[in-house]
Regions:
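N-terminal beta1-alpha1-beta2 submodule of the flavodoxin-like/Rossmannoid cofactor-binding fold
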Residues: 1-103, 163-186
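A short, mixed-charge helix-start or loop-turn motif at secondary-structure junctions
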Residues: 5, 54, 116-120, 155
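Short histidine/acidic/glycine/proline-rich micro-motifs that form metal-
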Residues: 10-13, 77-80, 120-124, 154-157
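A short acidic, helix-capping loop that chelates divalent metal ions and anchors anionic groups
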Residues: 40-43, 153-159
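Short, glycine-/small-residue-rich phosphate/pyrophosphate-handling segment
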Residues: 103-146
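Short, solvent-exposed loop/turn segments at secondary-structure boundaries
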Residues: 125-127, 158-163
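Beta-strand-loop-alpha "switch" segments that mediate conformational coupling across diverse proteins
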Residues: 147-152
């Protein structure tokens, strides 16, 4: 199983990153820190003659994502949604849909994804919209939504106090490792 973690936070060492570290401990993963990529906003050519798309790191990042079987989105909850960097990346999927819809959807189909979201202000309630947004995105492109964990944290390290979120991440880790082990015995 090829696994990538997409880290959406604007800072390294934050709570969503730590929660992801707990989940993927001991696994070989492709760590994709969105702060390492320059992703420009989508140029909407749906109803016009196509022009050129931005020259940025979108394709490089997308190529790494498309090689994976399992995607883990580790994100803070910013204003009840995902951070701008992650939204820009997903918005650009519209570019891939326009360029070669069938190929893009075929390559996305069959992937699984987990969402790890961390916020401070009643995240289990105020993070619901973010989780629903991911459900709709995954449904549209054919990714199976495997589950999510919502944790509480604001300052770096706060997630360490959320025993429920840490436990949930460890349970997902056990499931993934069991699936990987079962797959290696076939």
């Amino acid at each position: 199983v090829k696994i990538a973690v997409l880290y959406a936070s604007s800072r390294r060492g934050g709570n969503s990153e730590r929660l992801a570290e707990v989940l993927v401990e001991g696994m070989d993963v492709d760590s994709l820190f969105l702060t390492d990529y320059r992703i420009e906003p989508i140029v909407d050519y749906r109803h016009t003659e196509p022009g050129s798309y931005p020259e940025d790191d979108y394709r490089k990042l997308l190529d790494r994502v498309l090689k994976q079987d399992l995607l883990i989105f580790a994100t803070p909850i910013y204003w009840y949604g995902m951070p701008g960097r992650l939204k820009l990346f997903i918005d650009r999927w519209s570019q891939s849909l326009r360029e070669n819809r069938k190929e893009f959807l075929d390559r996305m189909a069959g992937k699984r994804a987990y969402v790890l979201a961390v916020g401070d202000d009643d995240p289990h309630v105020k993070g619901r919209a973010l989780i629903e947004q991911f459900r709709h995105i995954f449904d549209f492109v054919g990714i199976r939504f495997a589950g999510h964990v919502i944790g509480r944290g604001n300052r770096p390290g706060d997630i360490e106090q959320d025993a429920e979120a840490l436990s949930a991440a460890r349970e997902i880790r056990k499931r993934i490792l069991a699936e990987m082990d079962a797959g290696s015995h076939r």
